Amino acid sequence: MCVKRTDYCSSKNANSLKQQNYESYPKTMRVIADLHIHSRYSRATSQKMSIEEIARFARIKGLNLVGTGDFTHPKWLKEIQENLTFEPDTGLYKVAKNPELPVYFMTTTEVSTIFNFENDTKKIHHVILTPNIETAIQINDRLVKYGDLASDGRPTLNLDAPHLVEEIMQVSHENMIFPAHAWTPWFSIFGAFSGFNSIKECYQDMTRHIHALETGLSSDPPMNWRLSKLDKFTLVSNSDSHSFWPWRLGREANVFYLEKPSYREIVNAIRLKDKEKFKFTIETDPSYGKYHWTGHRNCHVALSSQDAIKLGNVCPVCRRKLTKGVEQRVEELADRPAGFKPKDAIDFVHLLPLSEVIATALNVNSPSVQQVWNIYNRLTEKFGNEYNVLLDASKEAMSHVTDEKIAEAIVRVREDRIKVVPGYDGVYGQPIIFDESAKEKLVSQRVQQLNLTDFM
């Protein structure tokens, strides 16, 4: 993948993107945006998740734009108002105490809707983008009728998806709403347990206001390209982060080339699928996601879609129903073969968080250990931020800052020359960078070397 003046492009990532010379866009800047995160008022979120900490680590990560998340929560909205200052003519905000920090904020939130549809209970998460705090307040005034906004940063609302869209659009047609993490088994539009089979089925006559779809960690653009009915929607990628740590924040993101960041430029680029402005998404390998394969965590069983189908989606150990993975769910809805790419598709690149790359190369269990931080800090201080390291820095230049094995690991990730043991049933996938045989060994361990035919 080429951005700016690099010459290391090769392998899958390089082939998935057209060669791009940053100098051919002399009046533009690269804007990397993570539009779906959470505040400390959301469940299972770091209590240190403040505006200042989000901005601090967004800069280190290389994010130019980050969503506020959770503007529906009264206490978080108050903190947004107190800690951010509006940037004129942008529809975006900066940190009031440090406006020189090169990080913009967009007012965003995620809501959960629970409703009945054809005698089934549907549970769908949606991301909402707004052009300013005033509009966010108007949205809150409408949504408070459907649920307790103070109960959670991501509130649960008792209304169906079409009426949610109607409420959002009645406030302003500048607002944007799209389904969150579209394929996860629970709380998603295509989820195996409480989702739909199409966007039209979910949003009904309000589908005309839906222009995008968030892929989530367990799927990537090629998986979504297999559904022809998704061609009209722009695929976006965000972290859904509940932490400011750089192995969570910005682990997936959207890359734009703009003269200046602005709400309208970003939203219009998404709505129009403008490939001149919306260049590509940053994705983790979908196998890294927690729900890529079908499986049962308690029994350490992880299965490909083919093997799960052979077993009737029943755990071969305990005989209980398996958690259907995203790979299998895509297979159920796909009407195209793997490898198909629509002609107007936004490009993508597979990456992993730099901390994860370093930890994997060092064979340590956590990206938070001091040894990883020491290398991470040296690289980001030298090259400016994490994305500069992952996307731009040459192997030779990195080798002057850290040992060659780390530099080689980063290049392999950049060029999509790694393997990942698939995640399943809430368990993250395991990246394999150097040991070519490790994936097969670990997959065998996860299915406990069972002979699947014994259970058919």
Task: Locate predicted features.
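Functional cores that coordinate and move charged inorganic groups
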Residues: 197-204, 213-293, 298-301
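Extended substrate/RNA-proximal surfaces in nucleic-acid metabolism proteins
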Residues: 25-30, 77-211
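Cys/His-rich short segments
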Residues: 280-342
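Active-site neighborhood of phospho(di)ester-bond hydrolases with catalytic His/Asp-centered motifs
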Residues: 33-35, 66-70, 106-109, 178-180, ...
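Active-site environment of divalent metal-dependent phosphoester hydrolases
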Residues: 40-42, 68-77, 114, 135, ...
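Low-complexity, acidic/Ser/Thr- and charged residue-rich accessory regions of DNA metabolism proteins
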Residues: 358, 364-456
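Histidine/acidic-residue-rich catalytic or RNA/ligand-binding cores of hydrolases
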Residues: 43-46, 77-81, 187-194, 225, ...
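An N-terminally biased module of ancient metal coordination in phosphate/nucleic-acid-related enzymes
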Residues: 8-12, 17-113, 118-121, 418-419, ...
